[in-house]
Amino acid sequence: MTVKLMKDQDLAGKRVLIREDLNVPLDGGRITSTVRIDAAIPTLKAALEAGAKVAVMSHLGRPDEGVYDAAASLAPVAKYLSEKLGREVPLVQDWIDGYSADADLVLLENVRFNKGEGKNDDALAQKMAALCDVFVMDAFGTAHRAQASTHGVAKFAPIACAGPLLAAELDALGKVLDKPARPLVAIVGGSKVSTKLSVLDAVSKIADVLVVGGGISNTFVASAGNEVGNSLYEKDLIPEAQRLRAQTEVVFATDVRVTKEGFKEWSHNSVAVAKKASEIQADEEIVDYGPETAARVAEIIKNAKTVLWNGPCGVFEFDAFAQGTEVVARAIAESEAFSIAGGGDTLAAIDKWNLADKISYVSTGGGAFLEFVEGKKLPAVAILEERAKA
């Protein structure tokens, strides 16, 4: 794919509007993970160093569109940026019809406070475009949404280009999906086959080995004729699991950790017992890979040249159910393969064991990451490609 890049543009003295994904989790107004903001900061610094007058826009949360909601304000993000950059980053309210600011870097209040954002309204997008000489799309995490601040504005801005973060995401995913070094091992976890079926289909066509974890693995365990007790699985998708197994090499749990506790009783004091998948009882629930499966997956990763990871192998939020995910995560971190990881739960697992700097590329995208892996066109990237041809 060919898009214009921010690094190739003359930004000196220009008004540069940058769309970032600063949709961070908040707890009582306090940011609980700054990963997305930290990932965006190099782009902001690069634009400032190039002499640009920078305005940053983002969404946060799911407020009712067109209505101000203090709980969805980007004020905590502006405060964090100010602290991190050592300069005041003003938060600009009511900016859509133009604003005045002396600062070289401002944060525009939540784009979702503008009516028409979600429907990609042309009139709104034109107002956004009027605020800049150069529009920079740098929010991979929202690239799968055709909205005014991700797609529409790129249609109308004088210049529309990809920022360093977006470019790096596309480059990293391209290394996995276009011409990967082989063997390519894809690890897909999560709770349900149904929510990841298109991903499983897509990666089964390019991966040398497909490893499944979590509730997805449970459905495959059942497809092999095993009792799965009270485990989360999808009986109606057993034929799909069997089809995938016939299509490619699929690795799923042959031993598991189980508990007899109901999920409402799970705690950090819970206990899980390891056993063969063929020995699961009707009153037991699978919560993790068993040690043999985890070791087998780690060995597969050790021999890989490329690793794609999306989704945990068990209920890693509880330490008693986390061993499988930890073994796999550490194997990826220690591997010499090019590795890319994406998805919210995957990032949480990486954070849990502080492994981010040992993964080749950690994607900030959730839905966008999955849609790209599925081979879908991302609207925000497609419009940048169109503009690059013009």
UniProtKB/Swiss-Prot annotation:
In terms of InterPro entries, this protein maps to: Phosphoglycerate_kinase, Phosphoglycerate_kinase_CS, Phosphoglycerate_kinase_N, Phosphoglycerate_kinase_sf
Task: State the name under which the record lists this protein.
Answer: Phosphoglycerate kinase
User: Which family is this sequence assigned to?
Assistant: Belongs to the phosphoglycerate kinase family.
As for subcellular location, the record says: Cytoplasm
PROSITE patterns per record: PGLYCERATE_KINASE
In the UniProt record, what gene is named as encoding this protein?
pgk
Q: Which HAMAP family match?
A: Phosphoglyc_kinase
Give me the residues that bind substrate, please: 21-23, 36, 59-62, 112, 145
Q: What is its EC number?
A: 2.7.2.3
* Source organism (scientific name): Cellvibrio japonicus (strain Ueda107) (Pseudomonas fluorescens subsp. cellulosa)
Q: Please give one Gene Ontology molecular function term for this protein.
A: ATP binding
